[in-house]
Amino acid sequence: MRLSRYFMPTLRETPKEAEIVSHRLMLRAGLVRQEAAGIYAWLPLGLRVLERVCAVIRREQDRSGAVEILMPTVQSAELWRESGRYDAYGKEMLRLKDRHDREMLYGPTAEEMVTEIFRASVRSYKDLPKNLYQISWKFRDEVRPRFGTMRSREFLMKDAYSFDFDQAGARHAYNRMFVAYLRTFAGLGLKAIPMRADTGPIGGDLSHEFIILAKTGESEVFCDKAYLGFDIPPATVDFDDVAALQGIVDAWTSHYAATEEMHEPAAFAEVPEDSRMAARGIEVGHIFYFGTKYSEPMGAKVAGPDGIERPVHMGSYGIGPSRLVAAIIEASHDEAGIIWPDAVAPFDVALINLKVGDSATEAACAQIQSDLEAAGLSVLYDDRDERPGAKFATADLIGLPWQVIVGPKGLAEGKVELKRRAGGERESLATVDLLARIRRV
């Protein structure tokens, strides 16, 4: 893609309304634009990141055995009255009426909707277990939306819902998602620590938040440093192996880790002093087991082996892709701009032409772009007639993993310059060696 033809409205100055690093950089790099309080338009560069984040989430959800669906955003108020949450949810829920005066709502979550879908379709324990997930836009009318897409009113959410015949099956479903989440965040270039959490308005008996550590995190967390060295479950993990999954969950919950709300100073004091860590953290995922909280009042039942109908046991599992984009930036940036992990970068390579109009330089850039794209790499070619300094600043700001810098002086020696954005290392090499060098990382 040529930058001269792309839509990437960057900003030189930091917008006054941006309070945290990710919000500032998302606006300056042209990822998003605010359209109303807590509501953002995703521009081409930001949308590419969002789609890559969703691709990693889908890969791990599918691998765990979850099945994707898509539910309507506008829901009937009657479903929420069945569960008892319509009046309890509060002003965060956007309520509306259609032309026939029927009460509707813009879904902030979908437990009721998915329970209704399940109860209309599944009748026997033989059809269990089931885990259904979607990636869709939600709306919560926050009193004070802030921090850009970190705490917006409209947000993209991956929400999954498991249905099992009994508590043992539901716990296995919970463990599946626990392990899938560990792999998801690792696949996004993040080290997430699961922490016991409050169940909040969703309710239930068991809940974990997945927290990444960041200096600009929104809340304080407390944990054992041992978590930083834990190995991520491999791609070969067997999600049907109950004992293996339980072993992974036990290992990842055996040390102290708690959010500020669940923190127990006395228990934390038992952690060896040199292993204690109090830091700022950002919630990037939340999983819940809530038993029959929704299935009981909504009549989501299946017949067991004895023919008796029983309410199914449920869990829900959320990851916010739009929030994750901001969280990744909070965890990976420097003074010059964003540093995207390879897995989610909008493009793999920033190709920088130092002398637009020079036939040799333009021919070399065209060939490099063609070769890299033929090898499966995505390239953003800066062919603008701008000063080199401005091009370097733009490349650092948008944070693509690699920068390939092409100019007449280097080409005279048959070489180009390659820069790794994450560490800032630069090296001069022959164009024929470029692809092999990039792939070595």
From Swiss-Prot:
Is Aminoacyl-tRNA synthetase set as a keyword in this record? yes
Which UniProt keywords are listed? Answer: Aminoacyl-tRNA synthetase, ATP-binding, Cytoplasm, Ligase, Nucleotide-binding, Protein biosynthesis
Name of the top EC class for this enzyme: ligase
Provide the E.C. number(s) assigned to this enzyme: 6.1.1.15
As one GO molecular function, the record gives: ATP binding
The subcellular location is: Cytoplasm
Keyword Aminoacyl-tRNA synthetase assigned: yes
Q: Which reaction does it catalyse?
A: tRNA(Pro) + L-proline + ATP = L-prolyl-tRNA(Pro) + AMP + diphosphate
Give a single Pfam family match: tRNA-synt_2b
The Gene Ontology CC terms held by the record are: cytosol
Biological processes annotated in GO: prolyl-tRNA aminoacylation
The record describes its quaternary structure and partners as: Homodimer.
In terms of PANTHER family, this protein maps to: MITOCHONDRIAL RIBOSOME PROTEIN L39/PROLYL-TRNA LIGASE FAMILY MEMBER (PTHR42753), PROLINE--TRNA LIGASE (PTHR42753:SF2)
**What does the UniProt function comment say about this protein?**
Catalyzes the attachment of proline to tRNA(Pro) in a two-step reaction: proline is first activated by ATP to form Pro-AMP and then transferred to the acceptor end of tRNA(Pro).
User: What family does this belong to?
Assistant: Belongs to the class-II aminoacyl-tRNA synthetase family. ProS type 2 subfamily.
Q: What is this protein called?
A: Proline--tRNA ligase
* Organism annotation: Methylobacterium radiotolerans (strain ATCC 27329 / DSM 1819 / JCM 2831 / NBRC 15690 / NCIMB 10815 / 0-1)
